[in-house]
């Protein structure tokens, strides 16, 4: 059976995992890292860079480097690159394509299906957008799963015989969630969830960026935030300082030649203490506490009922965050999971549940936000309460607001406000053909259906005439089927171009290596090579050099192969002359002289070392 991968599509970093031998395993990327920056960059030559290589060149290419696109999922935000507009779904799909390719390289087989995680507090539009991104990337998204729920799966897989109530505190790069779950006998039941989709590590970075920029402006009269290259350098410095202050009480921010004016170049060289960082970000930390309170209220539990607090997301490494959660809950924090990888591992476990590889596990999730429709007076009338276990289906009968009304518009909303206008509009549709009657007489049954992905379907039926209308919610910010199809084709085109570009680099590098080794060996052999043979080899070397700067890969391959075979034959003749007894020498093969195969051997050695991982988290036995 083909493997289904689990993907944590993060704001700042993403991670991919797969089940192997009944356990979730994190798949390293092509660069050898276990997480991949969710960064996409477009180069002047049309090439796309994704992940760490894209992040590395962001300073020199800030206008065409896209970061934190997840924050715009489910909105009508567009990114304009060289007069081409890209939706958040398309940019996210590029990151997913990279994760998919890395998984295929690791597994040695094609990957077409995935489970993808989203913040628990994502609304319907954001979930649909995530599913669309998967489709554009060539993945069938079998399930959308909430990030804290995925984390609880990874935490609880080896604790199936225990009964625990856990609180998952998930502070990532751009979003924040709290979920309360009950674990017991293989059942993972979400009791309540709350959060903020606009709060994460990016906001902590921004506080530092503003502080550094304001300090510099006060001293030099220049606002660095107006310089795109300078602001990118500030972003990198802020992120680095934040990470360093998780283990040190002070760090130095040193940015030479950050800008210049009439008096000459300007530099930044300042010390930042952890105490100052805590002061700057205090309000952000405090914002994470209210969702804890609300999720407890929604679950019906008291804090004393909670057995474990699981910290998820890279931003939970911030000491002030850990201290605030400890003080607020009065409990020690469980550090038995890797905050960067646990969500992807949980997604892989859910994939295992779907394939039957993981047995005796039942996941019961909830809808994070209240669902309803607009009724007379603009009121939002609830059909499905937040924290209702999904999948679920609920119906309610409504009537007309005016005499003789023959059609009604169903305005579907999601949110906690009492007025429809204050909530998120998911969609509108019209039920026509209602028999004319005095207001209040027709009976219109509205049914909400939420699937296991948290995606909403709504139908309306006139019980008198039997007329029916329904929609799968597709908000104006979601892509149409035609737009998705177009994006899929563009993604395939990009993928083909990337593949061709990679092959071109490999073929040309191999040609360079063969030419170098041939010329070096020819020099080393000296007069052992006859003038006739030497001329023949030099002719073949010239043939490779003539074609290797072009784009005809088949011609380069053929010229390289001709050179290899020619030299192989001549070197064999030299060895035979040196050993007239007839013992066969090994023969010269340029491919084995530190070229491509040597690289492969190195890669094999690296692969053997994949199990040696530097970890910065503490493993505890939580049993």
Swiss-Prot record:
It comes from Clostridium botulinum (strain Okra / Type B1). The keyword Kinase does not apply. Keywords: ATP-binding, Chaperone, Nucleotide-binding, Phosphoprotein, Stress response. The gene is dnaK. Residues 604-623 have a biased composition (Basic and acidic residues). This is Chaperone protein DnaK. PANTHER family: HEAT SHOCK PROTEIN 70KDA. Belongs to the heat shock protein 70 family. Induction: By stress conditions e.g. heat shock. Acts as a chaperone. Coiled coil: none annotated. GO terms for molecular function: ATP binding; ATP-dependent protein folding chaperone; unfolded protein binding. The modification Phosphothreonine is found at residue 175. PROSITE patterns: HSP70_1, HSP70_2, HSP70_3. Residues 580-623 are annotated as: Disordered. HAMAP family: DnaK. Residues 591-603 have a biased composition (Low complexity).
């Amino acid at each position: 059976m083909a493997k289904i991968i689990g993907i944590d599509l993060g704001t700042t970093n993403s991670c991919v995992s797969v089940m192997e031998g009944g356990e979730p395993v994190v798949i390293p990327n092509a660069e050898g890292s276990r997480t991949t920056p969710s960064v996409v960059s477009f180069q002047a030559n049309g090439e796309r860079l994704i992940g760490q290589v894209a992040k590395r060149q962001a300073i020199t290419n800030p206008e065409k480097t896209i970061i934190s696109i997840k924050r715009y999922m489910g909105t009508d935000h567009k990114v304009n690159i060289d007069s081409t507009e890209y939706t958040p779904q398309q940019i996210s799909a590029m990151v997913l394509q990279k994760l998919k390719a890395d998984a295929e390289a690791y597994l040695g087989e094609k990957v077409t299906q995935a489970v993808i995680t989203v913040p628990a507090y994502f609304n319907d539009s954001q979930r649909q957008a995530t599913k669309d991104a998967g489709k554009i990337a060539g993945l069938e998204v079998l399930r959308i799963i909430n990030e804290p729920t995925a984390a609880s799966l990874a935490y609880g897989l080896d604790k199936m015989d225990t009964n625990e109530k856990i609180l998952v505190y998930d502070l990532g790069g751009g979003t924040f969630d709290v979920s309360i779950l009950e674990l017991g006998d293989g059942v993972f039941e979400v009791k309540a969830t709350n959060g903020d989709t606009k709060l994460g590590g990016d906001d902590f970075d921004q506080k530092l960026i503003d502080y550094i920029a304001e300090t510099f402006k006060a001293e030099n009269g220049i606002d660095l935030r107006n310089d795109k290259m300078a602001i990118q350098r500030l972003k990198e410095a802020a992120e680095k300082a934040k990470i360093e202050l998780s283990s040190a009480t002070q760090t130095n921010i040193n940015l030479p030649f950050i800008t210049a004016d009439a008096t000459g170049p300007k530099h930044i060289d300042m010390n930042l203490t952890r105490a100052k960082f805590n002061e700057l970000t205090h309000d952000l930390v405090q914002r994470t506490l209210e969702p804890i309170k609300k999720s407890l209220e929604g679950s019906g539990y008291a804090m004393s009922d909670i057995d474990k607090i699981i910290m998820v997301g890279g931003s939970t490494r911030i000491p002030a965050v850990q201290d605030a959660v400890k003080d607020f809950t009065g409990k020690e924090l469980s550090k038995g999971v890797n905050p960067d990888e646990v969500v992807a591992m949980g997604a892989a476990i859910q994939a295992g549940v779907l394939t039957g590889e993981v047995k005796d596990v039942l996941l019961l999730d909830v809808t994070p936000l209240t669902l309803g429709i607009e009724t007379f007076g603009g009121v939002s009338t609830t059909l499905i309460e937040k924290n209702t276990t999904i999948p679920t289906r609920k119906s309610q009968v409504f009537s007309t607001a005016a005499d003789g009304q023959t059609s009604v518009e169903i305005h579907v909303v999601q949110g906690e406000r009492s007025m429809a206008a204050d909530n998120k509009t998911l969609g509108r549709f019209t039920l026509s053909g209602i028999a004319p009657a005095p207001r209040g007489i027709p009976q219109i049954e509205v049914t909400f259906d939420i699937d296991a992905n948290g995606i909403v379907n709504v139908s309306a039926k006139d019980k008198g005439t039997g007329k029916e209308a329904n929609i799968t919610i597709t908000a104006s910010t979601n892509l149409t089927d035609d737009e998705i199809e177009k994006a899929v084709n563009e993604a395939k085109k990009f993928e083909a171009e990337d593949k061709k570009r990679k092959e071109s680099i490999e073929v040309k590098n191999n040609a360079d290596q063969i030419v170098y080794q041939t010329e070096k060996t020819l020099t080393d052999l000296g007069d052992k090579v006859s003038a006739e043979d030497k001329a023949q080899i030099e002719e073949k070397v010239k043939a490779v050099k003539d074609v290797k700067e072009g784009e005809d890969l088949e011609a380069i391959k053929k010229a390289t192969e001709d050179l290899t075979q020619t030299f192989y034959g001549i070197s064999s003749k030299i060895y035979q002359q040196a050993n007239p007894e007839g013992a066969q020498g090994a023969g010269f093969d340029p491919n084995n002289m530190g070229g491509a195969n040597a690289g492969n051997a190195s890669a094999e050695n690296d692969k053997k070392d994949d199990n040696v991982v530097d970890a910065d988290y503490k493993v505890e036995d939580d049993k």
